[in-house]
Amino acid sequence: MAAKDVVYSDVARNELLAGVEKLADAVRVTMGPKGRNVLLQRSFGAPHITKDGVSVAKEIELKHPVENMGAQLVKEVASKTADEAGDGTTTATVLAHAVFKEGLKYITAGANPVAVKRGMDKAVEAIIAELKKMSKTVENKEQIAQVATISANNDKKIGELIAEAMDKVGKDGVITVEEGKSLQDELEVVEGMQFDRGYLSPYFVTDTEKMVAELNDAYILLYDKKISNMKDLLPLLEQMVQAGNKPLLIIAEDIEGEALATLVVNKLRGVLNVCAVKAPGFGDRRKAMLQDIAILTGGQVISEELGRTLESATLADLGQAGRVVVDKENTTIVDGRGDKAAIEARIAQIKKEIEETTSDYDREKLQERLAKLSGGVAVIKVGAATETEMKEKKDRVDDALSATKAAVEEGIVIGGGAAILKAAKNISVNVEDADEKIGVDIVKQAVKAPIKQIAKNAGFEPGIVAMKVEEADENTGFNAATGEYVDMFKAGIIDPTKVERIALQNAVSVGSLLLTTEAAVTEVPEDKPAPAAPDMGGMGGMGMM
């Protein structure tokens, strides 16, 4: 086991602070509309240019072991804030540094760290309650665009693109970000339910130019086993012909042999307008997705587990959809004729499963199912001239998207660091002793850090800006882009309440942990022996010198 080094009390805390400062100094320059870029070296390829706080934080590893521990803890604040709220990483880092630095003065002067931490926790609770009072719900597409624009470093085009995507697929819809193939940003919306299974035979296509099968006003048969025998399908097909021969989409585990051949022949002869695809997913997820399609289209899954055979299927078991489009790789069901109440109940059930699951993979798959049921999928394709620019832009779009979802979830407050500053000014906290009051004061002081940093990056005097905003009315803040004091809601400078809340909670959580640290244990690097000098033998003639 490697030897360990231990440092105590003030020495440990000061070394931790040095590490936190190094990380915070690199991250804070990106803050606000006039924030600067940071250049990150890559082990291969071109350097990465970013204005995204969490990307900068992730790159930082310090040589000094105790300093590095401090930096890693604050890096955790940035990552956790990004994971939970999608944005606010720079705010969280700046706050964590401010809490630790401010608190260290009092701890060094003899305050009790545990009592100080209690006071800090009380202050955070009070500020969050105040933020919730200040919060307004997002009412229109324009506000969504404003939130997204700010998160994308004031890129209006990205803001408008995200607002349009949200508008098209609804707040539960899935919006994904991909690297585009052109210079322009593009939005592609898939309405209805789409799954990644294409037709089983190209003979099913109805449009040979586009190579797609389009079925209008179609019936949908859902079966959870393989279909290989035609006689199982015949009773149902006969009923369909008698009922007016509507188009039919068959979704089953697989369709092969005689059954597939017969369907293809009947399709080519014009007897049936039919298309067959495999069911999406595997195992239990396949059953769940078939059930989703059944609810969306108002049909039943024919399953032997439920005592049903394919031969017993009737027209009443079939789902219906206004339009089905099947290409080589995907099937899209638009305008499913399912019962609205049943669809809502299924959506609520999936939301509950998302809350309860502990697996990230399961959560992602459940969210995909939720989106497919509740509106559709939008894909934002990011365009740029170079790969470096593409990556930087994609970072910003991802940030903006997460912040927008957070705004829809918990509402919005004024931006520019003004919301937590004003919320802290209005709080009153019951404290039990002087040290708890110190904890409250530390947080009240620390919440000025974000607005001061935004002002500093824009070239204004930080102290004066913070004081003026604190004294102004509740909606007035500082527009760092123009240098004016404005009504932030009217100017469209807004932040999601969730982002502010989570940034503050995480920052104070780690800041107070660092303050209550009394010792730091690190590994002592082993001294590796210097490599031996190479043998000089064979150098004939050297003795003549």
From Swiss-Prot:
Known EC number: 5.6.1.7
A GO MF label: unfolded protein binding
Primary site of residence: cytoplasm
Catalytic activity: ATP + H2O + a folded polypeptide = ADP + phosphate + an unfolded polypeptide
GO cellular component, one term: cytoplasm
Binding site for ATP: 30-33, 51, 87-91, 416, 479-481, 495
Compartmental location: Cytoplasm
Class of this enzyme: isomerase
Gene3D superfamilies linked: GroEL (3.50.7.10), GroEL-like equatorial domain (1.10.560.10), TCP-1-like chaperonin intermediate domain (3.30.260.10)
CDD domains registered for this protein in UniProt: GroEL (cd03344)
Cited PROSITE patterns: CHAPERONINS_CPN60
Protein name: Chaperonin GroEL
Organism: Nautilia profundicola (strain ATCC BAA-1463 / DSM 18972 / AmH)
Taxonomic lineage: Bacteria, Pseudomonadati, Campylobacterota, Epsilonproteobacteria, Nautiliales
